[in-house]
């Protein structure tokens, strides 16, 4: 039994075996967190009521098996976000790219997350959702309004091992059209240890 455990341990350390991760889905209410979670879980698009209580799902994407927590985005739900920061491997922060009036509020919440010491080394995938709606913000516009124009790390494979730079990138997506978020998850998965 020891040899088998050792062998699987070696495979896992080389990134050749399935990784496990805890991922938080955060963002303001109506950004698409629950819709994304259900799309990833069983590829179904359903109208959802606003999330009132934290929910979790176990999912697999590629070689990563992860437990995803949808914590809700309304003001009362945001108070419990901090309770879930322990041992988190990545944060997926969704922004409604069409609802430009709430960009300042979304920036405020994102800034609070990015400045929280317990999340200092956690990779952040920021998804600008609802790009299928006419007049939704462009990626550059969203970066500007979130104050991220000079703070993202690049969409390719960037070696950040020896730096104190947190992986952080913006990807635009449309959950209802099933586009964009796959590239984002592929990007963030390379930083999940």
Curated annotation (Swiss-Prot):
Keyword vocabulary terms for this entry: Cytoplasm, Endoplasmic reticulum, ER-Golgi transport, Golgi apparatus, GTP-binding, Hydrolase, Magnesium, Membrane, Metal-binding, Nucleotide-binding, Protein transport, Transport
Chain positions covered by the region annotation Mediates recruitment to ER membranes: 10-14
Single GO MF annotation: metal ion binding
Ways its activity is controlled: Small GTPases activation is mediated by guanine exchange factors (GEF), while inactivation through hydrolysis of the bound GTP is stimulated by GTPase activating proteins (GAP).
Top-level taxonomic group: Eukaryota
Primary role: Small GTPase that cycles between an active GTP-bound and an inactive GDP-bound state and mainly functions in vesicle-mediated endoplasmic reticulum (ER) to Golgi transport. The active GTP-bound form inserts into the endoplasmic reticulum membrane where it recruits the remainder of the coat protein complex II/COPII. The coat protein complex II assembling and polymerizing on endoplasmic reticulum membrane is responsible for both the sorting of cargos and the deformation and budding of membranes into vesicles destined to the Golgi.
Protein name, per record: Small COPII coat GTPase SAR1A
Organism of origin: Arabidopsis thaliana
